[in-house]
């Protein structure tokens, strides 16, 4: 019951933000959810099939394609605005708490947290680029964090779809004890 009240207030806060011309309301709603229901992401993701998409480039396009394809059969929670940090994930899940599937674009640095909190069935890894080194530090560090998060998932339900064009992504995607097949683009 408490979570439902938090979600209603978050929606109202988002609507107020839009009405006042202070943005689209997604981030303020997500921050509100995380502040007043810190375990909301876990609770909202628990009854959903979750797909996470991450990489330096192509997250928004890929997540929109996946969401639209799945929308033909399922109700979808999706961060269609591109809000891919912690608050954006919370807001997307909170905006459609009864969705059957969550398709979530997540920032490269947020992916380990998102894997832990949402227990996804599928993680799509696109690429890791050096275009934001001021924020990402070093691509190898991000790749190691991805690999650790993927390896830490012991559910056996997690599948990883990874671009084999990027050696850092390949390294991230393969669990040391359990190599998985990867798809490679035909040339």
List each model region and its residues.
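Short, basic phosphate-binding NTP loop
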Residues: 1-52, 68, 72, 84-92
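Conserved nucleotide-sensing/catalytic segment adjacent to the nucleotide-binding pocket
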Residues: 90-127
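Short coil/turn connectors at secondary-structure junctions
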Residues: 45-49, 73-74, 97-100, 119-122, ...
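Glycine-rich phosphate-binding P-loop
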Residues: 51-66
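Short, well-ordered alpha-helical microsegments
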Residues: 85-87, 110-112, 168
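Acidic, Mg2+-coordinating active-site environments of NTP-dependent enzymes
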Residues: 48, 125, 129-187
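Conserved RecA-like helicase motor-core motifs
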Residues: 74-81
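Gly-rich Lys/Arg/Thr-decorated short loops/hinges at beta-loop-alpha junctions or inter-strand turns
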Residues: 65-72, 121-131
